[in-house]
Amino acid sequence: MQGGLHDAFVDELRDAYDAEKQLLKALPKLAKASESEELRTAFLDHAEETRGHVDRLEQVFASLDEKVRGKHCDGIAGIIEEGKAVMEEDFDPATMDACLIASGQRSEHYEMAAYGTLVAWAKAMGHSEAADLLQSILDEEKAADEKLNELAEGGINQQAVAGAIDDDSDEAPAARKRSSGKTSAKRAPASRAAKRGKRR
């Protein structure tokens, strides 16, 4: 079957193939920026899974007698750039981890949407081998997203909130001290004027 949905399907496959190649480079950087050992492991484990996704996509191309070729995925490229910007921020470690999880989940959700469509199209066109391979990738993307969610809700988000509260607590005494100093300075002239009045 050529033309129509087949061409759109192959186009989406090439987009997904490029996305996985980009993520192969990005995931180790997310791992390196992570403070949590569990989060670092999650990113590195998913990088290994991503290598498998690349291999399976190549099998999908072969099953369709299509040339293995990627097409630049602007969507994932944008998500990766946002992740790089986050890593340049001066956040406390827990907040950085929370933001890295958010970045990782953005890419997972993008891929889940893409693979969900690819599975549906493969089934509609009777490409059972391709559908099975793509479904296996989709299942791993969902599992990776769930793992990140567990890490976020299992302590990292709470640690980030606690860190923000501690920062506010540290700033409050200094702010009160500055405020107190300003009040004293304003009162001083009035106090001296009162003394002059008494001397008269």
For each of these PLM feature ranges, what is it?
Residues 1-200:
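Amphipathic alpha-helical hairpins
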